[in-house]
Amino acid sequence: MNNIVIVGLQWGDEGKGKIVDYLSENADTVVRFQGGNNAGHTIVVDDEVYKLNLLPSAVLRTGKISIIGNGVALDPYALISEIESLRVKGMDINPNNLMVSESCPLILSVHKEKEKLFEDLNGNHKIGTTNKGIGPCYEDKVGRRAIRLCDLENADELNKRLDTLLNYHNAIRKGLSYRVIKKEEMLREIEEIAEKIIPYRKPVWKILNDFVKEGKKIIFEGAQGTFLDIDHGTYPFVTSSNTIASQVMTGSGLSSNAYVIGVAKAYTTRVGNGPFPTEQRNEVGNSLFTIGKELGTVSNRKRRCGWFDAVLVRQAVQLSGVSSIILTKLDVLDSFDKIKICTGYQYSGKIYDYLPASRSIQEELEPIYEEFPGWKENTQGEKLAEKLPVNLIKYVKRVEELIGIPIHLISAGPKREDVIKLKDFKFSESVLVSY
């Protein structure tokens, strides 16, 4: 199978960027298909730390093509800033190896202002957004008033689109006694960045379909995680896009089938507010936070930490049709005497083997745990499966049993090469990397 989808099976921060980087050595193209610069992927190469927000992880490998699909909310200033920051580090990024869908909706200053304004109005009921303007941009896309990348080359079309956009936003701003935005301001903002961003504009859907015909290997890189999905996540504490594998088709324009790989941490984290059944507000949570260095890549906010939730991950596997799991950050658990896995929930005398949709129930769920002895050995940087501690293998096998699909790779360390192969993949071996 030449097309692979990488999705997060928790609330994001599972280590997807590192896994995409690992698998991309023998791929041709990596595609972002949803989200925006509210997602952060951290990759360590030769002790150099790279933090990517919008750019696909393939930009760190020469000879690869990186693509941003139409499902991405595109902040043009953030993209150009990220490109320039990587160029300073010696990366060659140009319109031949980075292509952006002409249909991408653009995040503008009006979106960031609206998001912050409404978060402030929500007071104690904030969602905990990154204030990057992602949600308001998607609102405008669905409302058919967004400015898209393709609009920037046609002055008449851009003027019409701006009229529609500002009619909506200024009506809201007036109602809240907020400063009205003049069209000339928006035009200046767009003109400042248009010349830099337009060269990357491409008919991505056509290019991807041509790549498939040519037999090229494509990796689709998801952002956030399953339970931040607007439809299937812990609503309303979710992102504004679909994060599961089916979004690949609408977010890239490619209708081809793909092999879906899910990435999950060996424990659980989430940033911001919202239900979290296995959260540990105690020494366990503090240890996971400290050892795992759990700070948001984009927001720099402290991630909440808890035990691995097999119920949550199994549900995510079913939602995205996942065929294979990669379990990351096992080394974070090296020092624990006891390790727990959530195998079910209890609420009001009833046992749940799934995460109910109701927020009120989600917030009151009591996790049911299985407890395992820790391995108490340093595993960071280990490369060979046969050298792993017995108790670690037992833990991995139990996770595998509970989620119902095989774990092919595990990760024990932050570096690109800190990946251990447990099983062969069912798709073409040429996609894999051997260290």
UniProtKB/Swiss-Prot annotation:
Q: Which GO terms describe its cellular component?
A: cytoplasm
Cell compartment(s), UniProt: Cytoplasm
The reactions it catalyses are: IMP + L-aspartate + GTP = N(6)-(1,2-dicarboxyethyl)-AMP + GDP + phosphate + 2 H(+)
- Positions annotated to bind IMP: 13-16, 38-41, 130, 144, 224, 239, 301
Gene3D superfamilies noted in UniProt: Adenylosuccinate Synthetase, subunit A, domain 1 (3.40.440.10), Adenylosuccinate Synthetase, subunit A, domain 2 (1.10.300.10), Adenylosuccinate Synthetase, subunit A, domain 3 (3.90.170.10)
Name the pathway it acts in: Purine metabolism; AMP biosynthesis via de novo pathway; AMP from IMP: step 1/2
Task: Kindly list the positions annotated as binding Mg(2+).
Answer: 13, 40
* EC class (word): ligase
Entry-linked InterPro entries? Adenylosuccin_syn_GTP-bd, Adenylosuccin_syn_Lys_AS, Adenylosuccinate_synth_dom1, Adenylosuccinate_synth_dom2, Adenylosuccinate_synth_dom3, Adenylosuccinate_synthetase, P-loop_NTPase
- MF GO annotations: adenylosuccinate synthase activity; GTP binding; magnesium ion binding
What EC numbers are recorded for this enzyme? 6.3.4.4
Binding sites annotated in the UniProt record for GTP: 12-18, 40-42, 303, 329-331, 411-413
Q: Kindly list the biological process annotations in GO that this record carries.
A: 'de novo' AMP biosynthetic process; IMP metabolic process
Where along the chain is substrate bound?
297-303
- Does the record bear GTP-binding in its keywords? yes
Tell me how the cofactor is bound.
Binds 1 Mg(2+) ion per subunit.
Active site residues per record? 13 (proton acceptor), 41 (proton donor)
**Key words, A-Z:** Cytoplasm, GTP-binding, Ligase, Magnesium, Metal-binding, Nucleotide-binding, Purine biosynthesis
Q: Which cofactor does it need?
A: Mg(2+)
Which family does the record assign?
Belongs to the adenylosuccinate synthetase family.
Q: How does it assemble?
A: Homodimer.
Q: Briefly state the protein's biological role.
A: Plays an important role in the de novo pathway of purine nucleotide biosynthesis. Catalyzes the first committed step in the biosynthesis of AMP from IMP.
Q: What is this protein called?
A: Adenylosuccinate synthetase
Q: What organism, scientifically named, is this protein from?
A: Wolbachia sp. subsp. Brugia malayi (strain TRS)
Q: Which gene encodes it?
A: purA
